[in-house]
Amino acid sequence: TLSETTDYTTSNSRLNAGILYDMTTISGEDLPDNIDKINGSHNGEGYIAYTFYLINSGKDTLSYDSEMTIENVTNGVDEAIRVELFVNGEKTVYGKTKSDGSGKESDCDKEFASSTEVMKDRREKLGPGEKDKYTVVIWLEGNDPDCVDKIIGGTMKLGMNFKIVETT
């Protein structure tokens, strides 16, 4: 079950973060320190932020796969996008491989998993009633060398999917 609150008074199988039109560039260093402490959609000027919970509402312990997919990109905006993912408070910053192919950008912890995936992971042994907290933050990194005029007006759509792979 997915929910925007810890008590999951309202639960869903699908959640949607708010859209930010005309996003301007910022530096990841300018993001608020408490960005993963606010539930639901909490966009700021220059970034999209969304916190939600995945709750095991069943009676069995389960393992699940998570993946963030790149569903649509225009104007090459993905070249300068950063995705910061907090899972239970642990932060990882993802970015596309440098244009010259020489690895990850210096402000990133990991490169995008592929041209169509930001990340993928497996969570083992989530017990009945337990919850995992996710915060997704997206911004245009102004210090990225690929953050140039040609990406102005570009759009990007991301999706995050969860799939149970095992129950005990």
PLM regions and their residue ranges:
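A signal for specific C-terminal beta-sheet/loop modules enriched in small/flexible residues
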Residues: 16-21, 25, 101, 105-114, ...
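Short, polar/proline-rich extracytoplasmic segments that appear immediately after membrane translocation
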Residues: 1-26, 154-156, 162-168
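A surface/secretory-pathway sequence property marking extracellular, secreted
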Residues: 1-15, 73-116
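Intrinsically disordered, low-complexity segments enriched in small/polar residues
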Residues: 16, 26, 38, 42, ...
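C-terminal, structured domain-capping segment
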Residues: 32-73, 114-168
